[in-house]
Structure formats: C-alpha cells, structure tokens
C-alpha cells in the first residue's frame, strides 16, 4: 500500500525552461567567487567537482569547508524574485487535489524557498509536509543518507512511497530503497520505473499504481 507521494521541487513542479535553476546556478558560482575568493573559472571547476563528488555544491561546502556557514550559502543562492520566473498553475493544483495520497516535498533547497515556489505556483495547500535540506542535516540528494532520513521522518518504508523527480540521479537511491520512481520531463525510462513527458502526466501513472499495488514478497 502506498502511503506518500513524494515530489522533488525545482524543475519537477515547474519546467526547466522557466530558467529559475539556471539563475540559482549563476548565484552558486557568484557565492563561490565572492566568499571563497576564487577566480570565475576555478569557482566553476569547484562547483563541478562538488556536484560529482558530493552530490551538490552545498554538500561539498559542508564536508570540505567548515568555515562556510551553510545557512549563509542557502540564503544567498535562493535570493531571487520568483515571480520573474514562475506563475500560478491551476492545472497543477487541480491535478494534485485529485490524488488522494498525502503529498510531500523532498528538496535540496530550504523550506523558505520551497514555500515561496509553492505559493507562486498556487499549490502550497496541496502538500502535507516539506522535507528540506535542513531536516536531513544538510545531507543532500542523491546521498543515500538523505533518503534514509526522509523515510525516518515520515515513518514509512521505501516501498510505501512514490518518488517524482526530474533527475535520474536523484531517483536511483530512492529506487534502491524500494520506492516506485517516476521521472518527469524525459522519455528515457531505462533506469526508473516510469517516465512521463510533463508533471501533469504523473496523474494517470499514480492513478494506475493506486488501483494496482505492486506485487509484494510474502514471508
Ligand atoms: Mg529537481
């Protein structure tokens, strides 16, 4: 039995073309340039290395740079006027409302950023909870520890969750814990359970899953 429908936030609830994450990326580079006093090229290289080695720039800073305050970083990179990038999405609100399963947000960002995005999209009232990067002790996706803490917070097993994400990399650790995985904005289902063209197409997949729970091994 499924108990939670878990959504990533950025570029899952709104399309990549919105350009918001690109702007956050620009601000991540700016933070590294200004606070670590790196030339732009080195900042870019460091960001890439953190992404490959630690999953996110934040995780890289937390692990390798105890002199950097993660809260200062998180505030800086998300300090963006969201209304320039996003607007209300009544169809998304309607879609979420039509799914009876409790919905939660699982994001590498902060709860403030998540609440701001949900408010601009007009879907804040559709989510039972927001698990942000603070609540998993700054262990970002795709590190396995983030997903283990998520399950612990929700008091569920992986196979009781459906995880919706725009990133294959962030779905795989969930799948390894037994979650049913839905990749948004992709036609490449090779490594995940389902892939859909856009967020509204999640609805029929979830509806079918709720009608037909997956086979379980019985002891
Ligand atoms: Mg995302």
Q: Model-derived features: where do they sit?
A:
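Generic structural signal for secondary-structure transition and capping sites
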Residues: 82, 101-104
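Residue-level marker of regulatory loop/turn positions in helix-turn-helix DNA-binding domains and
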Residues: 84, 88, 106, 139
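Catalytic-core regions built around general acid/base machinery
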Residues: 91-100
